[in-house]
Amino acid sequence: MGSDLNYSDITSPDLEDYDFSFYEKGKESEVRGKKVYVIWSIPRSKEVIEETGYKKSLVFVRPDINMVVRAIRWVKDGGYLKYVDTKKLEQIDGIWVATETYVAKKKGKATVHRTILTLTNVRFNQSLDEDLFTIRRMEKGL
C-alpha cells in the first residue's frame, strides 16, 4: 500500500481468531473526551500472527459507536510498535467514518515512519454503473 498500514489494518478481523480481555478491568478511559474500553487482542494462532504481522494489540473501542478509535500493535518483526490514532470522526449517511487517521511506526521512543490517512468526499449508497466493475477496469483502473 506504500504506507504504514497493511491489509489487516483496514479490514475487519475474524473475531474467532483472537482472545480478548480488558486491559484494566473496571478502569474507565477516554480518548478525546469520549469513553472507551481498552481491550487486549491476542491472536490464537501463529498463522494469524503471520497473516496480520502483529503479535498482539491493545485497542481502544468507543462503546457508543462500536468503533476502534486508537490501537497499539506489537509488530511481529523488528521490535516495532505501531500506533494508530483516529483524529477525526464524521457521521456520513448514518455511518461513522474515520476521516483522519494518524499511524506511527516506532522503535523505542523514536518514530521510524508515519502516515496520515485523510478521507474526503465520502459518499454511501450511490448508484454506480456496472461497467465500472469489469475485470479489466479492476486490474487497470479507470
Give the role of each language-model region:
Residues 2-13, 32-133:
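Gly/Pro-enriched, hydrophobic low-complexity segments
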Residues 19-30, 87-89:
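Short amphipathic beta-strand and strand-loop transition segments with alternating hydrophobic
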Residues 15-17:
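Short, well-ordered coil/turn elements that cap or connect secondary structure elements
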Residues 141-142:
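Short, solvent-exposed mixed-charge patches
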